[in-house]
Amino acid sequence: VSLIISSWPSIQKFGLAFLWTKEWDAPNDIYGALVPIYGTLVTSFIALLIAVPVSFGIALFLTELAPGWLKRPLGIAIELLAAIPSIVYGMWGLFIFAPLFAVYFQEPVGNIMSNIPIVGALFSGPAFGIGILAAGVILAIMIIPYIAAVMRDVFEQTPVMMKESAYGIGCTTWEVIWRIVLPFTKNGVIGGIMLGLGRALGETMAVTFIIGNTYQLDSASLYMPGNSITS
């Protein structure tokens, strides 16, 4: 309610078309938010697409598969990644990750995908290194520690008796994971994913370094520079 009241003067002057207009021309009082909205949603989606399965694997390994001597140091190492300032991720992404990403991923994948209908459009264009796809990958690296830590904690809440009973009737490790651990912890897993999504949507500095900060939406290519609401 407070947000609607505060934004009402803007809505009255510019209308709701502000949300789907891509032109931004301050001298002529034309303001469109489509470009940053699109950039924010797409980079966050890419980040979740990468981070969720990786975090899931890390959490399962730490709780069900890793030997006892490895669980604690590896868990601490994952948590330490969450303490790295976002500007460090951004600078690393711009100066180290982006050049390698352009040469070893964007160029070969672009050549392979270029002749595939629809999908090829997502990987077309020059390999800049920076852009929407690169920003999504950096965001994924940033949110993996958060999602993995939450998933690990909720997996550890599964009652030991339930797992031991499943093992007692002959279930394998993977059967225990899929039939006991996951059904018991699904709400916590969803909560961890939502935490990661919130982190991705609100990230500023790392995205500012790597997304390209170009106010344009002339191509569907994920290689193209873009913009986000926070950057």
Where do the PLM segments sit?
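Hydrophobic alpha-helical elements at and bordering transmembrane segments
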Residues: 33, 37, 41, 74-80, ...
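Transmembrane alpha-helix signature in integral membrane proteins
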Residues: 31-61, 193
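Transmembrane helix-loop junction
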Residues: 63-64, 95, 99, 103, ...
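Glycine-rich helix-loop "coupling/hinge" segments at transmembrane-helix boundaries
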Residues: 200-231
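Cytoplasmic-entry segments and transmembrane alpha-helices of multi-pass inner-membrane transporters
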Residues: 54-93, 163
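Transmembrane alpha-helices
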Residues: 69, 77-80, 84, 88, ...
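Membrane-interfacial helix termini and adjacent extracytoplasmic/periplasmic loops
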Residues: 5, 10-34, 90-141, 211-212, ...
